[in-house]
Amino acid sequence: MDESKKNERLQQLTDIQYNVTQKAGTERPFQNEFYDNEVKGIYVDIVSGKPLFSSNDQYDAGCGWPSFTKPIDEAEVIEHRDLTHGMIRTEVKSADADSHLGHVFPDGPQDKGGLRYCINSAALRFIPVDKLEEEGYQAYKKIFE
């Protein structure tokens, strides 16, 4: 992502969006926008707009954050070891904007790969299926057909 475009987008973020995506913060469980979303659509990076996750892969993990079994395209997320807070975890960041998204854990549904991408709502923008074309994401309509 172009630095000037990224800086422009960063200035448009709310405090919580900035804290989560740029300072690896975490929003409160069960008190965020998408933890219980049941509308069909895709989730894009709040900074770059790149598609990251689909509601088809979202499930209720009971943790209070949106949880997914996989990203739409693995090339759009970067995973690396996170040793903060006295834990060993795997951080998930967006590849294009280097935004902190959340963490991935090996305790997801076994029949869907066994992973749980636990993602902060503040790092995402949701595009419902009926708005995909209008928002320029028409290529992703096929996911829901």
UniProtKB/Swiss-Prot annotation:
Gene: msrB
Any one annotated GO CC term: cytoplasm
GO molecular function: peptide-methionine (R)-S-oxide reductase activity
Pfam family for this entry, one: SelR
UniProt similarity note: Belongs to the MsrB Met sulfoxide reductase family.
Entry keyword annotation includes Transcription: no
Catalysed transformations (reactions): L-methionyl-[protein] + [thioredoxin]-disulfide + H2O = L-methionyl-(R)-S-oxide-[protein] + [thioredoxin]-dithiol
Keyword Oxidoreductase: yes
Annotated disulfide bonds: none
Domain (MsrB): residue spans on this chain: 6-129
GO biological process: protein repair; response to oxidative stress
Keyword terms: Oxidoreductase
Enzyme Commission number: 1.8.4.12
InterPro entries: Met_Sox_Rdtase_MsrB, Met_Sox_Rdtase_MsrB_dom, Mss4-like_sf
HAMAP family: MsrB
Domain of life (superkingdom): Bacteria
Catalytic residues, chain numbering: 118
Protein name: Peptide methionine sulfoxide reductase MsrB
